[in-house]
Amino acid sequence: MGYLKWLGHAAFEVELMGKRILIDPWISNPNSPVTLGELSKVDFILVTHDHSDHLGEAVQIANKTNATVVSIFELAVYLAEKEGVKNTIGMNIGGPVKLTNEIEVYMTPALHSSTHGSPVGFVIKSPEAVIYHAGDTGLFSDMELIGRLYKPDVALLPIGGYFTMSPREAAYAVSLINPRAVVPMHYNTFPQIRQDPEEFRNLTESLAPHVRVYVMKPGDVLNLPIK
């Protein structure tokens, strides 16, 4: 059985098919339930873009655990050449890239900014679950296509506003993506993105009543597959 664990902000720990994956590992975020010292086994690190609250401690974790960092091509080159990361996979929007025989990742568009290459989201596909991490993004109509093409079991969506979708926009995104379940992220980390996740829950229940909303606290675990 796999799991999804929220580490605060946009950071998640995912275990699928026995492999441990970190997404946007800003482990030093003020709401993080773990420390760098507690991360001893990591197989892959997915980074949606190079902002410090998403790239986080990816370099330190990769160097400590020998994990492979997966990112947009330009960021992967930077991490390898300038930061000394030994194992990188630089890809671009599309895919798939096979991480193992049972796990593959696709890269999706995101409406945001980034210095090293485009900002992106990720779809992680495995027999246990399909997870869509939208990255930092505004609302865009092709989220419907992402939902139709990849059929995610769980969507991880930013709701903080200011830099990303607000609760209202994120709830509309849920109606486009049509996942089995949704987890709000990227909120209440600093004042500009202060939001009430219950507003997101209420809006989602109105726009997409068949989608389960899991409002998690940092450290909470969601077992996969979704029952």
From Swiss-Prot:
InterPro entries in the cross-refs: Metallo-B-lactamas (IPR001279), RibonucZ/Hydroxyglut_hydro (IPR036866), UPF0173 (IPR022877), UPF0173_UPF0282_UlaG_hydrolase (IPR050114)
Record's protein name: UPF0173 metal-dependent hydrolase Cmaq_1073
PANTHER family: UPF0173 METAL-DEPENDENT HYDROLASE MJ1163 (PTHR43546:SF3), UPF0173 METAL-DEPENDENT HYDROLASE MJ1163-RELATED (PTHR43546)
HAMAP family (UniProt xref): UPF0173 (MF_00457)
Gene Ontology terms, MF aspect: hydrolase activity
Organism: Caldivirga maquilingensis (strain ATCC 700844 / DSM 13496 / JCM 10307 / IC-167)
Source species, domain of life: Archaea
SMART domains tied to this protein: Lactamase_B (SM00849)
Keyword terms of this UniProt record: Hydrolase
Family recorded in the similarity comment: Belongs to the UPF0173 family.
Claim: Hydrolase is one of the keywords in the record: yes
